Amino acid sequence: MNIIRKLKPGTISLVLGPMFAGKTTFLIHCIYMLERLEKKVVFIKSTKNTRDKTIKTHSGIQLRPKQCKIIESTQLSDVGSLTDIHAVVVDEAHFFDDLIKCRTWAEEEKIIILAGLNASFEQKMFPPIVRIFPYCSWVKYIGRTCMKCNQHNACFNVRKNADKTLILAGGSELYVTCCNNCLKNTFIKQLQPIKY
C-alpha cells in the first residue's frame, strides 16, 4: 500500500523497530515523497544523537532534501513556530521527553511522522513512545534479521558494554540487535532479569 495515503494532515504516524532496521531510511523516503507533492517539511533530530551531524542512516544513506528544513534540538518545545510547515518528521523520537508536543502540531493540521526504537537495551519501552502511542493513527513496525544467528527476526537491542546509562548514542560499535533465542542464550548474562 502506498504510504502517502496514510500521511494525512492532523495525523501522527509512528515507525518503531530495533536499531539498524531502516527506520531513518523510511523517514528519508517519506520526506522525498512529501517534497514531490510540494509539501514543506521539517526534519527534527535530537542533539543527544552525537553520532553524526548530518542526516545519515547506519547503512550510509544520507538525506539530501530539496526544501526540507533540518533542526537539531534537545526538546521539541524549543523548535519554535512551524506555521508555514506542512509536515514534521522526528527521528530518534524516543530521545524527546516532550514527544507529546506532536499532538499540538497534529491539531494544527500538520502531518507528523515519528521514528524511534521499540525498546531500550534493557528491553523496556521508552516513556515518550508510550505517551504518544495512543494518539497515533498509524503504526509501522520495521524489523531486521538477528545480528548473532542471522536466522530469526531481531527485536531486541543489546548494548555490548556494561554502561547502564539509558541514553547512549552509538552504532554497531556499541549495540547489536538480536532475536529472542540469542538474547536468552548469549546476551542475557549482561542484562539484569527482565521484568514485564
From Swiss-Prot:
What name does the UniProt record give this protein?
Thymidine kinase
Q: Quote the record's binding site residues for ATP.
A: G17, P18, M19, F20, A21, G22, K23, T24
Q: Which family does it belong to?
A: Belongs to the thymidine kinase family.
EC number(s) in its UniProt entry? 2.7.1.21
Which sites bind substrate? Answer: F121, L166, I167, L168, A169, G170
Which EC class is this protein assigned?
Answer: transferase
* Gene Ontology MF terms: ATP binding; metal ion binding; thymidine kinase activity
Q: Could you tell me what reaction this enzyme catalyses?
A: thymidine + ATP = dTMP + ADP + H(+)
Physiological role:
Phosphorylates thymidine. ASFV replicates in the cytoplasm of infected cells and contains genes encoding a number of enzymes needed for DNA synthesis, including thymidine kinase. Important for growth in swine macrophages in vitro and is a virus virulence factor in swine.
Q: Which Gene3D superfamilies match?
A: 3.30.60.20, P-loop containing nucleotide triphosphate hydrolases (3.40.50.300)
State if Metal-binding is listed as a keyword.
yes
Q: List UniProt keywords, sorted A-Z.
A: ATP-binding, DNA synthesis, Kinase, Metal-binding, Nucleotide-binding, Transferase, Virulence, Zinc
